């Protein structure tokens, strides 16, 4: 079978001088070095368009076969946030009391974490990253995605960087298992919850 002609478009690329490259690299490094994980959030509202712009940045991530196998679910409804917190705390109580090996609990001890997750309700936004195993095309045919976890993880990293660049604090949360997120958010079984990102402004008393 003859090879298909690649569908490409002309690259628009901005070439920088060495001094510009150094300046940009240092400025971005200085910005990202100030990123911190936050567990105490203010309920202060965040403009939705800021989050949407960060989603757009995340969508520029490379992906296997350019399939972009991810879905970002944005949650602000207090009722849904409450359901997520309740379900997450059920799993976390199991984790801390039965599932976690002692060395993992020892590693967590200096952070002071436990099964209580008030930040899941306090923060204005929760973002659930779903990795999509398949896509359904315009004809209704199911097509397999490739390098799904790797692709969705790269997009998640860009999202966290974009949120920090926008002046927002984040927390990555991974209760295990996370299938309850599919149920609460009505996502199909072909999508696997990869991460829950808590997003907003830090509380005044926040520490890291």
Language model features with spans:
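Conserved hydrophobic/aromatic beta-strand scaffold that supports enzyme active sites
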Residues: 31, 126-128, 196-198
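C-terminal helix-cap and adjacent tail motif
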Residues: 2-24, 114, 195-208
């Amino acid at each position: 079978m003859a090879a298909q002609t690649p569908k490409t478009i002309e690259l628009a690329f901005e070439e920088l001088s060495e001094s510009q490259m150094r300046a940009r690299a240092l400025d971005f490094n200085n910005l990202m070095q100030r990123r911190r994980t936050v567990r105490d959030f203010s309920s202060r509202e965040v403009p939705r368009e800021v989050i949407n712009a960060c989603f757009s940045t995340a969508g520029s991530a490379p992906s296997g076969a350019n399939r972009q196998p991810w879905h970002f679910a944005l949650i602000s409804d207090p009722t849904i946030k409450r359901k997520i917190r309740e379900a997450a705390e059920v799993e976390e109580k199991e984790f801390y009391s039965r599932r976690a090996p002692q060395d993992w609990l020892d590693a967590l001890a200096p952070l002071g974490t436990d099964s209580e997750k008030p930040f899941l309700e306090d923060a204005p936004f929760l973002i659930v990253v779903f990795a999509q195993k398949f896509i359904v095309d315009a004809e209704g045919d199911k097509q397999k995605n490739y390098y799904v976890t790797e692709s969705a993880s790269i997009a998640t990293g860009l999202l966290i960087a974009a949120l920090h660049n926008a002046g927002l604090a984040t927390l990555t949360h991974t209760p295990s298992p996370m299938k309850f997120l599919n149920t609460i958010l009505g996502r199909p079984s072909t999508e696997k919850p990869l991460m829950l990102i808590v997003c907003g402004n830090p509380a005044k008393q926040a520490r890291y």
